[in-house]
């Protein structure tokens, strides 16, 4: 909803993604477009009232067949974090693991969350960080609401320079960029994607 309110409709195919990336914009490919049967499995949440294995599978998928991709994984419970850690290591996965809220990775503008990063299944201390603890010295100026339209307006104000980027978000973004840069330096990152 936030991307829609920013004027960025969902991508419906690979060409839409390529056009968004050519404009240096993010692209959102709905799960139903990426893998319709997985969307059916995920939709069982409404019927069952709990997340099922479909949500876990969706987080673990590499959306770029045959190419390296950094997966941003999230967990709400320590045992799920342990499961994802074991998977990242045993499957030689490129992943960044963060705590989650409502199933999505935390991007807290007030404090830095714990971030663990694996490249080719190896934990990277240089691309990981402990959670910020203790009292906050200062709070960033944030909007009073959390709805999609309010968040989209806030994002536009930050991007345009009208508001500063909260330091925890800047650090988190820098860590993602550093992990992707390290991923791109690997020899297998230069290999052509499988057909």
Label for each model-derived stretch:
Residues 1:
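Walker A/P-loop NTP-binding active-site region of P-loop NTPases
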Residues 10-11:
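Internal gly/pro-rich beta-alpha loop/helix module
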Residues 5-6, 16, 21-195:
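Glycine-rich anion-binding loops and their surrounding alpha/beta cores
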């Amino acid at each position: 909803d936030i991307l829609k309110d920013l004027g960025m409709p969902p991508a419906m195919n690979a060409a839409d993604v390529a056009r968004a990336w050519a404009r240096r914009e993010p692209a959102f490919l709905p799960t139903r477009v990426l893998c319709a049967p997985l969307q059916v499995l995920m939709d069982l949440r409404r019927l069952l009232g709990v997340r099922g294995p479909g949500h876990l599978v969706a987080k673990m998928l590499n959306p770029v067949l045959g190419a390296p991709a950094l997966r941003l994984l999230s967990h709400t419970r320590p045992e799920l974090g342990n499961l994802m850690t074991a998977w990242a290591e045993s499957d030689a996965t490129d992943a960044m693991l963060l705590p989650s809220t409502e199933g999505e990775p935390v991007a807290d503008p007030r404090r830095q969350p714990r971030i663990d990063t694996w490249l080719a299944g190896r934990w990277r201390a240089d691309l990981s960080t402990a959670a910020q603890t203790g009292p906050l010295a200062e709070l960033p100026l944030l909007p009073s609401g959390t709805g999609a339209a309010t968040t989209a307006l806030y994002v536009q104000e930050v991007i345009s320079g009208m508001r500063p980027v909260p330091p925890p978000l800047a650090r988190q973004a820098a860590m993602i960029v550093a992990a992707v840069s390290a991923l791109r330096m690997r020899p297998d990152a230069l290999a052509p994607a499988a057909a």
